[in-house]
Amino acid sequence: MKYNEGANLDPSQVGGGGGGGNGGKIAIGGGAGVVVLILALLLGINPGDVLGSGDQADPGTGQAPASPFAQCTRGSDIGKDRNCRFVAYTNSIQDYWGGTVQDYQVIKVQTFTGQISTACGTATSEVGPFYCSGDTAVYLDLGFFDELTTKLGAQGGDAAEAYVLAHEFGHHVQDLEGTLQRVQGGSGGTGPTSPGVRLELQADCYAGVWFNHATNDPQSPISEVTQADLDDALDAAAAVGDDRIQKKMQGQVNPETWTHGSAANRQKWLTTGFQSGDPASCDTFA
């Protein structure tokens, strides 16, 4: 991916300095158990519910007021501080959805270290990136991207990171559309055709739609997305497929326990979104 050095960035959309609190409600073991938890919850949407800690917590606990992204005001700042790329991803994704979804609500990406309290409960780094509908925010430990390559086997790269964030913003769009509420209020269950898997695949498709439009605006902070970038995004999508995860961690595949979809289906829906550029093509519930 290449960046538009002359583009304006809005650092207010990305916060940092959260985490490190001692009042966590989620206890997570170390070693392989941590990896399993990352894999099980990767790109999820409510860690409190999944981990059995649905009690609401004070979102302000452990968060520091200063943001490490405040200096990210121009595309050229990415060359000075690589962390500014997260502002570029976030701005571009929200610029697209803001012009596509009626009454779109701009939200914030909150980065943290260790653990953080949210309206969905207290989450730790091991949960992976997630969207919390309770406070309409995306939460991200930047160290997750090292886990994506070293433990999940993805190639990584900027486009892989952008895919992860675009997927989470896909959940925000689902929240605004009411899809998230319908799925969470339904019968639930797991498996390739379960509502939860369909929800995740739709978020993958929405990520692909954004990739299609990422460079359309001359003022976009992202100036180029190459085929190699798309390959990195597809590689990341496959790395978090349930079958790949189960094969790696358990040595066998059990489709009936899937929560996010197979590697092939995640790639399929990411590709569908990119090729169509149309959110209407992302009806994974049909």
Each language-model region and where it sits:
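Post-HExxH zinc-binding segment in Zn-dependent metallohydrolases
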Residues: 1-15, 191-219
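Long amphipathic alpha-helical segments used for membrane anchoring, targeting, substrate engagement
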Residues: 1-71
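Active-site recognition of the HExxH zinc-binding catalytic motif
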Residues: 38, 97, 140, 163-176, ...
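Catalytic zinc-binding patch centered on the HExxH motif and its immediate surroundings
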Residues: 51, 115-141
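Short helix/loop segments within enzyme catalytic domains
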Residues: 84-90, 94-102, 202-245
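Short pre-active-site segment immediately N-terminal to the catalytic Zn-binding motif
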Residues: 146-163, 191-197
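Catalytic Zn2+-binding segment of zinc metalloproteases
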Residues: 169-184, 215
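Pan-zinc metallopeptidase signature
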Residues: 241-286
